[in-house]
């Protein structure tokens, strides 16, 4: 008898009493797992009445303590964040700063009020990461979200993962990143099947946007898509922006410390993405009605009327974006704290609150060091600007941008020029191999031959920098040195090493994340490293280097935000020392002009984001445009102007005054204070007086607001159509152009935007007429002359027995008065594919004949190209597409696209269908019937799906005046083509066909999946051992921490920030979340009354997740793994790769790893419930796992007790794998026994260690 075997002293019990005792104990354990502590308490007491023993009494005591603690805590476990309505776990809430709580309340207000998205634009270093994590914690706890996609630069992944572990250790967080395609797919499927957060990078998004936007052959809509460093999509025609738009999402959040970096069009791009086109109208209207007046008003020579108009338009823009936009600077936070020091005294626990008080930031002095060029630099600089033959010698291409590049290099160091140019300037020798040397070569041979003294004497900046760094090292400061050029860092590194400096360096060549982390930690912990060399683009984002107290910006950037990002690596929360920044700028050169433009852009940022109502105007339009004029190279006009304005405002102390006196002794031209810019606002009285007198200004503001609102409403009407064309683009096959694109010869910047929005002209009639199509109006150089190029893009997708997928992208010219797009969609169907193909062939011939005539007539000649679906095309275009970079603009130069459906493409489709059908002939009859039923169901609804699958018409009229507009669907196709050609497209035709084939199996399996057992109790550290089955079980459970791939800190409860709530709430929707699929819904309902996702449940969820990961890794590495164990990507990459697996599968079903949501499935013989649901034949004996006890398993398939007993015996004999097989089968029969589950966990752990 079981009871007597467990407890020898229980032999006095009758069989009936023993059975009752075991039943009560079992039911009490299940109640504990389900979080029903009252029921568990009652059942354990009943068991105690039958047979009192120490084990039962200890459990009763633990549950009683937990119930008492819960009664004391009540609903205070959660706290309403700033009375917003979002409840946040109290321990987490108490660790947040006040401004962070306000940020979380803002994020929740977006969701609560039905806004589709927003921008959190807090200054760098104020904790945007923590705000997002805490917000997601509250949303998951309240079951308001299930699936979140988080996109960020590569170097921030480790930071985010660590923050998630630190703040919400129970949240399910996976990464979609790294070299292992199988691991990426498994992590993504785990989040999509259940719930949680998936973290990926912008480059992964570009390569795998199709995979991220789909699941099992269907569109997958994320609850939230969150972009960190969202200024990556500031230009909406880049591949990052296009692919981000293709991800279906209910809500979108953007995080950036620099929402505007160059112009207001970047702000429009961010809001257009975040609000899905429903806020700021079209780019053309925004540029005309908002950007141009605001920009003109910021110039020093603007008229009073222009200043007043810009002021009111700026106010109106701020009012529009205010509900969707939140930005706080460090200065704002500090001022608010100092003005209200008693704000937190009314909290219940002031001791805890004191921990969360915003620390005082140290003082920052941002100095501009104006440096004179040395005679050699000045001579070359003057000759280059004034003499054409010098330009010809030093430049390979004649363009203003290239000229500016050469001038910038001359300001920094003449040796930055090519080896050939240095030879012509008598700066060194020139050899043949130097001619092929790259501009950014890390090892510059012609510099290696130059002495240190010569390198220093040739650059005024280098002379100053060496003296400065020596002084800072002697004073004990650690310094960051930023430059945009790796060659400059090479020179600085060489000079410093020869002077015995200990230096570290991070630039674009340090690609491994672990190596970056190692160098950062070394600098933070070791004071001996006095200088850290970084490139501005790589080292200026996402790093925390608060060990340094001095920052040197060697060369200014065109973008003020770039330099500001670099400074904020040091000046952020956690910095306790005063910070001094040195920006090195040469007098009278192009660098001074760049700095002027920085100041001007900064004024736009401050006014538009609400930091300043009317910032000071420093420069006129003419002063900003004079880039190539030579001014006084010994003194700076800008420095003299700023000194006269701000000299008396500098915040200083004795040490800083002494240091500035030392800097003046180094022969510099002067010092000005960058941090004092815009410290004094201009009076708005002048502007307000003009506004009151001018009825015109009020009308302009009303007109601008009306146009934006009107266009935004029209765009909402188009969103569904655009979504089916753009965000559902993963359903289409790639279309390969037959010829490469050529740049338009007369367009400087043909940069179309991938916007799902209308691009309208100025008249309301055109706005209204464009409701049914995306319209972009092309204004040719002469006003009034328009060239309308209309095209219809037809996508036809057919389901051939649910296997093959035929697609034909046909382009035809839309005749005038042909009717609306909606009518065309209504009249079309899947059966019209042949007629469309015939018409397109005729159109193709006519277009080819008329092409030369039309090109001759065009004032703005644009190239045309053809789309042909053929194998030869794929091979021809491949090398050209690989040259596209992430920031390249994807253009469509006024195309007359033509698509012909060739025999090759049709044959390819039919071959795929034949292969898939042939593979399925060996499947069981019932499985085929299920598949056919689902196919028939899909084919019965052609009218509902035809706009998305069959025919999708889009009318495009190009607008060259609005170069930023784009056709996102075509751009996505270009990204898709590029990815598919280079082998990185995640979903091939075979992959989608396979997913459709297995669709019926996947849905039928959901109800049979075992589920996780978790503790649903609001219990702190005192009651954390409720679910223990005794000391042995506790030990076995604790041992599972060794398989945690994140961090062992999940089980270190001493840290105050490792909270136990904020886990993804496990709902009961399929697929199941618990081990037992038989947990009644009423139990789960009662659990949500006042319970939090407390520590034990959170940690158990994490452990079970890690066990599943381990199991899948074991399955993947098993020599005898079944066909369902290999990842789905084997099908995606090539059909030939899966052949060796399909040979082992008698039923012909290739089951993907995403279907193994149960942690119990290790082999086909053990998946009895799945075989039953599929109706598949019993597996052959040859498919049994190596060494499995076939005789015992065959006899005891449905005998739970026998399987458990056999498993224990095998475990005692040391046969881990065989014991695991038996226990897995037992759990398939009855999965609610915690003793067997914990024993299985222990076996998995032992097997993994072995």
Swiss-Prot record:
GO annotations of cellular component type: cytosol; kinetochore; membrane
Class of this enzyme: hydrolase
Compartment annotation: Chromosome, Centromere; Chromosome, Centromere, Kinetochore; Chromosome
Enzyme Commission designation: 3.6.4.12
Record domain Helicase ATP-binding: where: 109-277
Name this protein carries in UniProt: DNA excision repair protein ERCC-6-like
Designated gene of the protein: ERCC6L
Top-level taxonomy: Eukaryota, Metazoa, Chordata, Craniata, Vertebrata
Homology family: Belongs to the SNF2/RAD54 helicase family.
Function: DNA helicase that acts as a tension sensor that associates with catenated DNA which is stretched under tension until it is resolved during anaphase. Functions as ATP-dependent DNA translocase. Can promote Holliday junction branch migration (in vitro).
Organism: Homo sapiens
Residues recorded with modification Phosphothreonine: 813, 1063
Start and end residues of each Helicase C-terminal domain: 464-620
Key words of the record: ATP-binding, Cell cycle, Cell division, Centromere, Chromosome, DNA-binding, Helicase, Hydrolase, Kinetochore, Mitosis, Nucleotide-binding, Phosphoprotein, Repeat, TPR repeat
